[in-house]
């Protein structure tokens, strides 16, 4: 991409607070972008060939939305965790295997998409983020839902297409979780805690494509109670 075209994008972003440069074959963050660290509210560099998120990202103090989908990123810098106003973070289609310890500092974060990465565990940092609403961790390599999950504040959790064979009963204690997607995992029916159906807030449980027939779900204790929640939710949005 030519310098003049990049300059034009940066000039526009200076006025709008939005920098969008997708599918341009970029291999690194545009260095001139740091001139706008006090301006930008949105950055979208999706569908490029970026491998490294530079530490300068931590200087974008007003940033609310960051999209780096479909790049070649394998790790996130600690400095990213300084983005106190960040509400939306899209990182699907990268090579990320873990999150920085300081990820817990992203206290404004509401939406996180890490679909199609290399996570093997459910990141514990997510259980400390009080404003998190939607989490997409589908298409990773996660094998279990741990006991600590009860700290998760999300309303929707997508774990489709992982390798999950174990679920902690504590998933039932997530205070706001209404939508749980577990399609195409490695679950036996016996590994599904009945309390997910009877004692949780969950009104949509998607478990198609596991190691049991979906109609067997009806045999679980608490299924009728779950169906009441499911039907009530459907009526609300009808």
Curated annotation (Swiss-Prot):
Residues spanning the signal sequence: none
- GO CC entries: cytoplasm
Q: Which InterPro entries match?
A: Leu-rich_rpt, Leu-rich_rpt_typical-subtyp, LRR_dom_sf, LRR_domain-containing
Which regions does the record annotate with the repeat LRR? 39-60, 62-84, 85-106, 108-129, 131-152, 153-175, 176-196, 201-221
Q: Keywords of this protein's UniProt record, alphabetized? A: Leucine-rich repeat, Repeat
Cystine pairs: none
Decide whether keyword Methyltransferase is in the record.
no
A Pfam family (short name) is LRR_8
> SUPFAM superfamilies, per this entry?
L domain-like (SSF52058)
State if Repressor is listed as a keyword: no
- Known PANTHER family for this protein? LEUCINE-RICH REPEAT-CONTAINING PROTEIN 57, PTHR48051
Question: Any idea what this protein is called?
Answer: Leucine-rich repeat-containing protein 57
Please name the source species.
Xenopus laevis
């Amino acid at each position: 991409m030519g310098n003049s075209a990049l300059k034009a994008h940066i000039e526009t972003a200076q006025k709008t607070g939005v920098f969008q440069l997708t599918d341009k074959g970029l291999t690194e963050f545009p260095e001139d972008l740091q001139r706008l660290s006090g301006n930008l509210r949105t950055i979208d560099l999706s569908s490029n060939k970026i491998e490294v998120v530079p530490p300068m990202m931590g200087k974008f103090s007003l940033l609310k939305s960051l999209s780096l989908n479909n790049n070649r990123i394998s790790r996130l810098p600690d400095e990213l965790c300084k983005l106190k106003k960040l509400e939306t973070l899209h990182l699907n289609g990268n090579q990320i295997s873990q999150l920085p310890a300081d990820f817990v500092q992203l206290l404004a974060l509401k939406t996180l998409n890490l679909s199609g990465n290399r996570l093997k565990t459910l990141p514990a940092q997510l259980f400390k983020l009080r404003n998190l609403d939607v989490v997409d961790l589908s298409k990773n390599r996660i094998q279990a839902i741990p006991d600590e999950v009860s700290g998760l504040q999300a309303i929707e959790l997508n774990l489709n297409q992982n390798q999950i064979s174990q679920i902690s009963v504590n998933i039932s204690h997530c205070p706001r979780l209404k939508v749980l997607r577990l399609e195409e995992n490695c679950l036996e029916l016996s590994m599904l805690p009945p309390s997910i159906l009877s004692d949780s807030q969950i009104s949509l449980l998607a478990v198609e494509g596991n190691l049991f027939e979906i109609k067997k779900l009806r045999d679980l204790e608490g299924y009728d109670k779950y169906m009441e929640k499911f039907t009530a939710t459907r009526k609300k949005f009808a």
